[in-house]
Amino acid sequence: MNNFKYLLVGLAIFNFISCQNKPSLQSEYVEGNALGTSYHINFYSEKSENWEQGFDSIFEVVNKSMSTYLPNSDISKINKGNKDVKVDQMFREVFNLSKEIYANTDGYFDPTVGNLVNAYGFGAEELNELTEKDLDSLVSLVGFKDFYLTEENHIQKPNKNSYLEFNAIAKGYTVDRLAVYLESQGVENYL
């Protein structure tokens, strides 16, 4: 009989604990434009807040660092020949990851093809009429192996006309930063 009392008390405690109010998750949906495209983010959160402000701050920092479409971004300054630009942590991470991918693909992934991309009208500049000589000249500027990150966090490039762009990797990197932000806010499920 004593065991039965303990069982009833245990079940009552379990029932009380399991029926307590848990914070309810709210479905959140945020959409907008950034990095030259649109984005849509679905997630569940216990708190309702101005999520756009947090997302926009991430987009702003990424753009300031790596957008070839913004003339005052760090990468645009580097592409114009400014050797004094001290790159931030995000730029360094993307640069080093690009070096790794460049090596693992035997150079097929190369973030220095920007001059060619622009010449064909796919980048930040307008399409130009190209001769074979022009193409040869542009191809000679391609080669990520000759770019270096110095200990002082400056980019050393082989030719003042070499052009660096992370468009093939920056959007994915930004998604990773958004995920870190959401998780830091207690969000576990997001898309």
Show the residue positions of the predicted features.
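Bacterial N-terminal signal peptides that target proteins for export
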Residues: M1-L7
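Short, conserved phosphate/pyrophosphate- and ester-handling motifs at nucleotide-, phospho-/glycolipid
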Residues: K171
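Short active-site segment of divalent metal-dependent hydrolases/proteases
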Residues: T174
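A contiguous, well-ordered beta/alpha segment that forms the leading edge of an enzyme domain
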Residues: F16-N167, V180-L191
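Bacterial N-terminal signal peptides
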Residues: L8-N15
